[in-house]
Amino acid sequence: MVLRLSQLFLRTLREDPVDAEVDSHKLLVRAGYIRRAAPGIYTWLPLGLSVLRKVEDIIRQEMSAIGAQEVHFPALLPREPYEATNRWTEYGEGLFRLQDRKGADYLLAPTHEEMFTLLVKDLYSSYKDLPLSLYQIQNKYRDEARPRAGLLRGREFIMKDSYSFDIDDAGLDASYAAHRAAYLKIFERLGLEVIPVAATAGAMGGSKSEEFLFPTEIGEDTFVRSAGGYYANVEAVTTVVPDEIDFSNAPAAEVLDTPNTPTIDTLVDAANQLAPRSESDGGAWTAADTLKNVVLAVTLPTGERQIVVIGVPGDRGVDLKRVEANIGSHLPIAGEIGLEAANEEDLKKLPWLVKGYIGPGLSLDEPVLGLEGSSKVLFLVDPRVVSGTTWVTGANAEGKHVFGLVAGRDFVWDGVIESTEVRAGDPAPDGSGPLETARGIEMGHIFQLGRKYAEALDLKVLDQNGKQQVVTMGSYGVGVTRAVAALAEANNDDRGLVWPRSVAPADVHVVAVGRGDEIFEAAEKLSLELEAAGLDVIFDDRPKVSPGVKFGDAELVGVPTILAVGRGLVDGVVEIKDRRSGEAENISVDKAVDYVVNAVRTR
């Protein structure tokens, strides 16, 4: 195929779009691949659609290789299946909801678990029909509060989502492993570096979960890794729990006056003045000796606002993403929630809690925090708060703190939650060394859903003994539009895009540089010969465009090989340039086609 720029629907831009924040967004718009239709919504232009289709083709090939079959669901879905799994409510404000003229409720699909489950339920009824894997490549919709970064976080996007159906957990393990291997092949063929990391299931539910992250400083996800091979999304990192301590000989807790000490820093200063410690007793007080009780407000999908207090060592901050990922095991919810620091109105309703001096209570006989305490608020603690650890914390009175409060002796808690920030240097939970942190973009996510959706929608089959068994499921997603953006993010320079050959909109970009008919005819002839050799060609045949603009557009568009026909034609040579390395060679005209074909097939 030869795309003639004189006919191609394309306009390149010299300046970055004003709303663009990241390289991929800037360059995809400037090079004429996409155009913004509305915040978080983009139109795909011919060159962009070519790249998108090549990404989709690679995904289809690898899905087919593991036996997955393609289907296509509507994007507009009825409310009822999502009501059955509670996700109509649980998705909160992130779900696009609408009504038809008769008042019936519909949604624009964020994911299709329910529809896949119902389809299999409708058609299959025996263990002999399993295992089964189905997939689709389809538009998805999420009402992002702040769409950003072009295709990386939009309101409409394309995903490949697949689902496996098995009779037992062993089958699910096999399906999960097959999809995991397929994903690694997909990203390898795309030329995109990804790292599989342990993850939490979030709104999807289920047990085992992994994300495939593209490492980049602009990523919204933080992950950790160790030299020994531990990788995890920061939300999934578990704390190395200290041993419990015998507190039988620990001295009684004591309340001290600590005026004007509402912060950890002021408390530590006061502690070192009021109750200095010798080196044998632990040395100077530090923030790590204090128990900071953070009051959070959780807005449930129903709109109800629930207060939660989390006790953490004072030298640690609370990571709201980690709280959000792990709070579901302590509250009867799933799906999207709102999470923020409690405000003044929240605290007014809880007079037992004195801002800056909040503590769990002075003894087990008079608990303040916890569902059994006077405040009746859920009290969770960091895993480092184990029985026998001793703390300085608030006494629930203005200007007073309690020293020597012993966990398990003087206070208890409703549960333990992974909530604090993960730091570089923290030990890996598997003992593989200290952690280092990095940022990345989620390119794919795989889940062992188990029986959550099958139970909710009554998907059962007859087993070998003629008994009804609930099917176990896996869910596997790849962000297709996000993959295009990540490829653009990873493959560019100061002149424009530099596509990998596997997804480039063409194999070679032919530029006719000069005004003579001979130059144009030679460039056209080479373009047609390259097409006949099986290559996709962009031919810049624009008659009234300067050589500088043509070369600038060729580098901006980012096809891997640029073939320029110009003044060298009088000597029987053309220039062939590798877009990525910048290396250029003069090749004789009669060898140019073979040279380019060889470059395409060997690089």
From Swiss-Prot:
GO terms for cellular component: cytosol. It comes from the Bacteria. Signal peptide: none annotated. Consists of three domains: the N-terminal catalytic domain, the editing domain and the C-terminal anticodon-binding domain. Belongs to the class-II aminoacyl-tRNA synthetase family. ProS type 1 subfamily. Homodimer. This is Proline--tRNA ligase. It comes from Paenarthrobacter aurescens (strain TC1). The lineage of its organism: Bacteria, Bacillati, Actinomycetota, Actinomycetes, Micrococcales.
